[in-house]
Curated annotation (Swiss-Prot):
It comes from the Eukaryota. This is Spindlin-2B. Interacts with C11orf84/SPINDOC. Residues 50-99 are annotated as: Tudor-like domain 1. It comes from Homo sapiens (Human). It holds the Pfam family Spin-Ssty.
């Protein structure tokens, strides 16, 4: 496997860099500082685009328009204008207000709904979800890079893919991890005796923090504002956060044990 990055699809160019809470650890993901968004009036309800293939242009400042294609994975219940999108050739999951963001141009629905893929080994899938892992990637000149992270969940729509995040870069990625596991590139780390596995409570997770606004102070003293948009069922102390100035989805443990 290649080191996680944001490989550009055909006709795509790197978007402008935005402020980050953490270093990118030699990653080349696309970043941007978001500007104010305003809704566009609509006389009728918009169609459900979750599961659809989409394409659109992207216009950032004075940069030339670039073209993007991807799959809409989910619509965020706490903020229905926000969609999670897996773009072709990009390892990260992006969060964008597709109908409101003025940088999104000529949004087109390419297909009504993609056929849901199936996992080859349901038992193995259940085994890796919620686990701390070591994920091996091929670095420069054939070297091996080891990334420690956590498998968060099976991705929606694209069921053969899994959400994962890393200690080096706590944003939301997705990969076909069962293939990596079978090829020896994904290894489940032994559970620490000091931190017993979290048991899932019956009836799902408590979502008391979902929808809450959070403030993050960066190393330079500047602050960024975001919203908690999702709680990870397999690890209830772990949440997804969408910051106003970035379209990446950040993954943080908000209930750190002292």
């Amino acid at each position: 496997m290649k080191t996680p990055n944001a490989q550009e699809a055909e006709g795509q160019q790197t978007r402008a860099a935005a402020g980050r809470a953490t270093g990118s650890a030699n990653m080349t993901k696309k970043k941007v500082s978001q500007k104010k968004q305003r809704g566009r009036p609509s006389s009728q309800p918009r169609r459900n685009i979750v599961g659809c293939r989409i394409s659109h242009g992207w216009k950032e400042g004075d940069e030339p328009i670039t073209q993007w294609k991807g799959t809409v994975l989910d619509q965020v219940p706490i903020n229905p204008s926000l969609y999670l999108v897996k773009y072709d050739g990009i390892d990260c999951v992006y969060g964008l207000e597709l109908h409101r963001d003025e940088r999104v141009l000529s949004l087109k629905i390419l297909s009504d709904r993609v056929a849901s893929s199936h996992i080859s080994d349901a038992n193995l899938a259940n085994t890796i979800i919620g686990k701390a892992v070591e994920h091996m990637f091929e670095g420069e000149h054939g070297s091996k890079d080891e990334w420690r992270g956590m498998v968060l969940a099976q991705a929606p729509i694209m069921k053969a893919w899994f959400y994962i995040t890393y200690e080096k870069d706590p944003v939301l990625y997705m990969y076909q991890l069962l293939d990596d596991y079978k090829e020896g590139d994904l290894r489940i780390m032994p559970e620490s005796s000091e931190s017993p596995p979290t048991e899932r409570e019956p009836g799902g997770v408590v979502d008391g923090l979902i929808g809450k606004h959070v403030e993050y102070t960066k190393e330079d003293g500047s602050k960024r504002i975001g919203m908690v948009i999702h709680q990870v069922e397999a690890k209830p102390s772990v949440y997804f956060i969408k910051f106003d100035d970035d379209f990446h989805i950040y993954v943080y443990d908000l209930v750190k044990k002292s």
